[in-house]
């Protein structure tokens, strides 16, 4: 990573704690490896409870992006589908409302506990990487003045 450091907030669900705490550990170590600063970690009861915490972090000038971490495990009803879809929708809304990246490190819906355990590292590290890349790339967009030819930002 070059230039201005990237400052992250992490919102992590306590529900399915055995999974989400490992996700948090992986995310913290990966952010450090990529030289990003994790400024705040907020724990919320479940993924459905994330939007308010995300919004509060996005309001802070010292947060460039928010990483969400959670696991929505399949149950016997469609509750997991409702939780996952409503949370994802609101996360996208908040990202565009505040013009800051919010990345989705939420395992599920439809995942079994075993599948969630297998996906811990993948989802946690990808969410951190996505947040960092999006901050870097949106900064490049902000620096554009006039474009006469196609610009590829990566």
From Swiss-Prot:
This is 6,7-dimethyl-8-ribityllumazine synthase. The active site is at 79 (proton donor). (2S)-2-hydroxy-3-oxobutyl phosphate binds at residues 76-77, 119. It catalyses: (2S)-2-hydroxy-3-oxobutyl phosphate + 5-amino-6-(D-ribitylamino)uracil = 6,7-dimethyl-8-(1-D-ribityl)lumazine + phosphate + 2 H2O + H(+). One of its GO terms (biological process) is riboflavin biosynthetic process. PANTHER family: 6,7-DIMETHYL-8-RIBITYLLUMAZINE SYNTHASE, 6,7-DIMETHYL-8-RIBITYLLUMAZINE SYNTHASE DMRL SYNTHASE LUMAZINE SYNTHASE. GO terms for molecular function: 6,7-dimethyl-8-ribityllumazine synthase activity.
